Amino acid sequence: MRWSMFAFFIAAAAAAPGAASAAGEKSPAEVTTAIYQIYAGPKGDYQTGNLDDKRVVVYLSKSLRAALKAMEARSKALNEPILDFDPVTDSQDPQVEKLAIAAEGDTAATATFFSGDVKHVVRYSFVREGDVWKVDDISGGAGDEKWDLRDIIKPGKK
């Protein structure tokens, strides 16, 4: 059941209107869908995904990749994590259920899902690099739990 619901939302997101060109370019919603497909892994349990995965990295902007690499170097020097959760699953222990991905204008997409009874909304902001949409920031949470990947990984944190 879980996998069939995932497949339904993937199909719905792929059919969503977006800023994709006729040349087969992926819209922000389609890029977001592709990231969650990679994260789901072969079992659909979201236990294998991470931002370092070479299949995910290709969807990140050059600027975001550079910022993540710089954060990793600072993290190693400090011998402690700066980014201590996974932004795609908005967790330390991934549990993604009832995933729905939607376009948010032409330059963003949101992934809405549940971890048990907890609803998560993760927003992906995109930039164009050449003719391709790339993820340039990820944010989520609300209230005191609100977070922004760029804010977390920027120099001066930790």
Feature annotation, model-predicted:
Residues M1-A7:
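Bacterial N-terminal signal peptides that target proteins for export
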Residues A13-A19:
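N-terminal signal peptide c-region/cleavage motif recognized by signal peptidases
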Residues A23, V57-V118:
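Surface-exposed, charged secondary-structure patches
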Residues K26-G44:
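Short, aromatic-enriched amphipathic alpha-helices that serve as compact interaction elements
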Residues S27-T32, D52, V56, L60:
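Stable alpha-helical elements in mature extracytoplasmic
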Residues K43-R55:
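Surface-exposed patches in mature extracellular/periplasmic domains of secreted proteins
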Residues A102-T107, T112-V121, E129, D137-K158:
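Low-complexity, intrinsically disordered terminal/linker segments enriched in charged
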